[in-house]
Amino acid sequence: MLLKGFMLSLVLYAVYHLASNGGQFMFDFSGQSKWERAQSEVRQAILDSWHTYEKYGWGYDVYHPIKQEGENMGPKPLGWMIVDSLDTLMIMDCPEEVSRARDWIKNDLDYTFDYNVNTFETTIRMLGGLLSAYHFSNDDVYLDKAVQLANALHGAYDSPSGIPYSSVNLKSGKGIKNHVDNGASSTAEAATVQLEMKYLSKLTGEILWWNLAEKVMQVLESNKPQDGLVPIYVNPDTGKYQGHLIRLGSRGDSYYEYLLKQYLQTNKQELVYWDMYRESVEGVKKHLVSDSYPSGLTFIGELDNGIGGKLSTKMDHLVCFYGGLLALGATGGLTLNEAQSLKSWNEEREADFKLGEELTYTCYKMYHDVSPTGLSPEIVVFNEDTSKSKDFIIKPLDRHNLQRPETVESLFYLYRLTGDVKYREMGYEIFQNFIKYTKVVNSEGEVSFSSLSDVTSFDSNGLPKFKDNTESFWWAETLKYLYLLFDDTNKIPLTDYVFNTEAHPFPRFDTNDYFKTGWRRKIDENEKAQMRESKVIDKSNLPEAQPVDKSADQEAKEIIEEIAG
């Protein structure tokens, strides 16, 4: 056993030094500009590692790059890797890889087997990935699977309040309460299915999914959260928040993200979401923002005991999405110069954008200041004590790096909106460190990438501490955002698209009398948010996918006329 471990260490040692190459890339992209080369390097990293996954882990939901083997999370595959990564391959124009993925989805993927899935994760990764793939290809295979999956997921919303249960059984459609946290659902998870469900309704003309998603938001808003800040748990039986913990990290993050993105998805026509978003931003500024010592890094803390309690200086890497979100909210997807020329530009938007830049710089420092890898840990704790010399500390249990996307996501937004090359430089530094310290090359010279268990030290052989796991969001989000960061052709224009929280781009669209928000905010205790009446749907006979040849608007009008008749 000891000999086997020693030999494995020797192999990994050789692999690591082959992969690191002194921090430089081995690819030859002569004749390209600096950022064209950077984009080509990202593309090569994606394709090299994807081909290795195709060879050793094809179809499996989980991939172990060092063992070179995969496994499924349940009795059958969910498409975790393939579906989540598909639109990245489409955006990069990889027809052969896309064709193989399509064949697998058509022939091997099925969402009707007996297995409990997380409602949120399955929605943002699988449903989101299928819908984005359909948008880029107009291939019914993807929409058919999306409808099949949505039919399986809809039972999660059959709670007394309309707040989805944390899990659902794909075969029975029965929603399942969380086994911990007293059965509560995560607030972020409940409020981060709306883009996907609404877009599916828009594509199919079926309002069921739209109404399920909107009902969640109406229930959450009826709690009238103070200053727009919400606890991270909500009870699916009552629709009331549970506990007092407020944070923009895990279980809280994407609630705030989807307030803005629902507003943008429907071309800024649903002001209720802009109002909720603006209120939450002011709440964040008032209660959660602070600065570190000695460098004055702006960070977002947590309120363990709710508003009025002491601010914890802990910040998840997950929070790093917020800098880009603030910048996107300030400009609406226009460049900063374009937005500043409008009459709607004001001190509020200026302050939002500035805060977004400051937070993104802090997140960059969470990489840059970490030795020896230059990679961010999962969580840091910022210092406000003037007697200490470091801006943040990393606790032993928080030293891992899962190759998360949030920092490069914000760098992508800020570069697109400002054109400031410093954001590309920051992103390229992070990319280089990912290549140097997470790249694994097997004896055949085949490339993979692995998460790390510790970014602050190497093992006894001087090697990175690999977790032997590749997350699907490495391809779906992190490398996609890096690819787009270095893109000079404005792929996926921010004025035309909104990215879901798993980086799947959806096109913006207009509302109409059929597809629109059917409730209004609760102004006072005596006025209840009103849900509009809608066609009663027989949930025992849900629709098969019927991709529309005509526009969804025309389809909706015909349905309305049918109901009225």
Swiss-Prot record:
Its EC number is 3.2.1.113. It catalyses: N(4)-(alpha-D-Man-(1->2)-alpha-D-Man-(1->2)-alpha-D-Man-(1->3)-[alpha-D-Man-(1->2)-alpha-D-Man-(1->3)-[alpha-D-Man-(1->2)-alpha-D-Man-(1->6)]-alpha-D-Man-(1->6)]-beta-D-Man-(1->4)-beta-D-GlcNAc-(1->4)-beta-D-GlcNAc)-L-asparaginyl-[protein] (N-glucan mannose isomer 9A1,2,3B1,2,3) + 4 H2O = N(4)-(alpha-D-Man-(1->3)-[alpha-D-Man-(1->3)-[alpha-D-Man-(1->6)]-alpha-D-Man-(1->6)]-beta-D-Man-(1->4)-beta-D-GlcNAc-(1->4)-beta-D-GlcNAc)-L-asparaginyl-[protein] (N-glucan mannose isomer 5A1,2) + 4 beta-D-mannose; N(4)-(alpha-D-Man-(1->2)-alpha-D-Man-(1->2)-alpha-D-Man-(1->3)-[alpha-D-Man-(1->3)-[alpha-D-Man-(1->2)-alpha-D-Man-(1->6)]-alpha-D-Man-(1->6)]-beta-D-Man-(1->4)-beta-D-GlcNAc-(1->4)-beta-D-GlcNAc)-L-asparaginyl-[protein] (N-glucan mannose isomer 8A1,2,3B1,3) + 3 H2O = N(4)-(alpha-D-Man-(1->3)-[alpha-D-Man-(1->3)-[alpha-D-Man-(1->6)]-alpha-D-Man-(1->6)]-beta-D-Man-(1->4)-beta-D-GlcNAc-(1->4)-beta-D-GlcNAc)-L-asparaginyl-[protein] (N-glucan mannose isomer 5A1,2) + 3 beta-D-mannose. The keyword Metal-binding applies. InterPro entries: 6hp_glycosidase-like_sf, Glyco_hydro_47, Glycosyl_Hydrolase_47, Seven-hairpin_glycosidases. The active site is at E378 (proton donor). Disulfide bonds join C320-C363. The keyword RNA-binding does not apply. GO terms for cellular component: endoplasmic reticulum; membrane. Its cofactor is Ca(2+). GO terms for molecular function: calcium ion binding; mannosyl-oligosaccharide 1,2-alpha-mannosidase activity. It comes from the Eukaryota. GO terms for biological process: carbohydrate metabolic process; ERAD pathway; protein glycosylation. Ca(2+) binds at T501. Residues 526-538, 550-565 have a biased composition (Basic and acidic residues). It is an enzyme of class 3 (hydrolase). Pathway: Protein modification; protein glycosylation. Residues 526-565 are annotated as: Disordered. Keywords: Calcium, Disulfide bond, Glycosidase, Hydrolase, Metal-binding. Pfam families: Glyco_hydro_47. Belongs to the glycosyl hydrolase 47 family. Involved in the maturation of Asn-linked oligosaccharides. Trim a single alpha-1,2-linked mannose residue from Man(9)GlcNAc(2) to produce Man(8)GlcNAc(2). PANTHER family: ENDOPLASMIC RETICULUM MANNOSYL-OLIGOSACCHARIDE 1,2-ALPHA-MANNOSIDASE, MANNOSYL-OLIGOSACCHARIDE ALPHA-1,2-MANNOSIDASE-RELATED. This is Mannosyl-oligosaccharide 1,2-alpha-mannosidase. The gene is MNS1.
